[in-house]
């Protein structure tokens, strides 16, 4: 199993390039940055993890594509990933250009994780109807794939339409970078399969259920699509079982306020995954 690190990179942490060099030096396969454009000062939406108050880094994180570019240009082999880009809140033509640009500048090292979002007020501030976000997500993935794959692209969907547009650079990864759909709900597997995306499940309390779902996804995709685990429990036995079921990667969320703090957490992860991690 490939092992990565996830960090909320903000104006109060190490810079993305400093973080990336450290993560690569420790031998991790990938580095992931979340995506929030802002934090509403008043929100009735509860965090999926049940926080009583949303962490301050949600309002302070750097733009995900700027951070990924800095991380990629500071390293040689480290894969860089969005974990996850809130695609319903972004223009698909502009985002396709940004994704392709990062993949081009990184030499094909981008992993494009996407999600529908969970903070209702945040998406409403972008003019997104929360009830439409899952349809928007699927529509925009398909539209962006057309832009990446075709020299002259057209798309006519429910939420996105354009006719005969040209956009370069094209991604180094052809026909497009790896797209991973972040979702945990009962329709998560079907949603990922519908847009030909890898599955990116978050932490599950039901370990046996997650193992079964990973195996189901791999079987239903005939092994063509992968599974990456977002911040699973750091339990060697559970990770080994998930790897056996077909999960190819896991990344773990750690703080990054200082080099010492990062090294402490990365050392613990390295020790826990010894014997599970693959190059």
Language model features with spans:
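Active-site-adjacent structural elements that line small-molecule/cofactor binding pockets in enzymes
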Residues: 1-279
């Amino acid at each position: 199993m490939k092992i990565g690190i996830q960090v909320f990179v903000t104006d109060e942490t190490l810079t993305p390039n400093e973080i990336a060099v450290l993560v690569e030096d420790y031998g991790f396969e990938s580095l992931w940055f979340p995506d929030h454009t802002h934090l509403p000062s008043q929100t009735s939406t509860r965090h999926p993890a049940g926080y009583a108050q949303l962490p301050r880094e949600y309002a302070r994180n750097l733009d995900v594509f700027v951070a990924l570019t800095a991380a990629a240009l500071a390293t040689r082999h480290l894969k860089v990933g969005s974990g996850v880009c809130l695609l319903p809140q972004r223009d698909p033509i502009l985002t396709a250009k940004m994704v392709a640009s990062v993949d081009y500048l990184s030499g094909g090292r981008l992993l494009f994780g996407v999600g529908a979002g969970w903070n209702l007020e945040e998406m409403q501030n972008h003019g997104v109807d929360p009830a439409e976000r899952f349809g928007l997500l699927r529509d925009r993935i398909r539209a962006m794939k057309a832009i990446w794959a075709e020299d002259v692209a057209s798309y006519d969907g429910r939420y996105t339409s354009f006719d005969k547009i040209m956009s370069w650079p094209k991604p180094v990864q052809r026909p497009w970078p790896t797209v991973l759909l972040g979702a945990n709900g009962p329709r998560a597997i079907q949603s990922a399969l519908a847009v030909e995306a890898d599955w990116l499940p978050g932490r599950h309390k039901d370990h046996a259920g997650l193992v079964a779902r990973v195996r189901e996804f791999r079987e239903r995709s005939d092994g063509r699509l992968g599974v990456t685990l977002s911040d699973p429990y750091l339990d060697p036995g559970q990770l080994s079982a998930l790897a056996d079921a077909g999960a190819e990667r896991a990344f773990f969320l750690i703080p990054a306020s200082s080099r010492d703090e990062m090294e402490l957490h990365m050392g613990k992860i390295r020790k826990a995954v010894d014997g599970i991690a693959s190059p």
